[in-house]
Regions:
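Glycine-centered secondary-structure boundary/capping sites
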Residues: 77, 170-171, 201
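Glycine-rich, phosphate-binding/catalytic loops in enzymes
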Residues: 72, 176, 205
Length: 205
């Protein structure tokens, strides 16, 4: 059985959604980031980087959301969770997930999770930079009701992690980000996503 290490509400939510959408046989283990559980010898033996998500498989541990999403899609091809049979489309899927991981996540994370919190001027600049990345998705990546057009992929669940964070912080203006807000509503309405939110003690935002 697959074992996914998560911290509720954190970015590992994307991998949790992926496994639930795939109908995978898996269990979750909570890593409490607030108490520093990610730095314990027990967890560092799973993921030496001390971060979540980490997916324990029968062949070893996979870390980083983009890698886990690709693994889940490729090991559950019947669920059509990514365009795994089209090299160009699959590259686009991976590129988008890479953007979320390397660009959008750090940008919104700086706004919300900097310790100590940013001073007013620095926070305003960080918000502007984060919103520019959301704008890029709004204007250039959303190709329909879902990121890649008419069909849901695991990239949609990943994007929803960060639109949830932005909406919760009142940064996802409904007029400026109409597409992203509508997309988030669609993702949160999916039965698999509802089950994952409930399992992590979360609710739709």
């Amino acid at each position: 059985m697959l074992k996914l290490f998560i911290s509720p509400g954190a970015c590992a939510l994307a991998s949790h959604i992926a496994l639930e959408e795939a109908g995978a046989d898996f269990e979750t283990r909570v890593v409490d980031l607030r108490t520093g559980q990610q730095r314990t010898p027990e967890y560092l033996a799973v993921n030496p980087a001390g971060s979540t998500p980490a997916l324990q498989t029968d062949r070893g541990v996979i870390t980083q959301n983009p890698a886990i999403l690709a693994f889940v899609a490729q090991t559950h091809p019947d669920r059509n969770l990514a365009p795994i049979d089209d090299p160009h489309a699959f590259a686009a899927f991976n590129a988008f997930n890479g953007f979320l991981s390397s660009s959008l996540h750090p940008a919104i994370g700086k706004v919300l999770f900097s310790r100590p919190p940013l001073e007013a001027g620095a926070r305003a600049e960080a918000v502007e930079q984060a919103l520019a990345r959301y704008q890029l998705v709004e204007d250039h990546w959303l190709q329909g009701p879902w990121v890649f057009g008419d069909g849901f992929t695991l990239a949609d669940g990943y994007l929803a992690v960060f639109t949830r964070w932005a909406r919760s912080a009142h940064l996802l203006d409904s007029a400026r980000f109409h597409g992203l807000n509508a997309h988030l509503d669609r993702v949160q309405a999916r039965p698999a996503v509802s089950r994952v939110l409930a399992a992590e003690g979360l609710s739709a935002v």
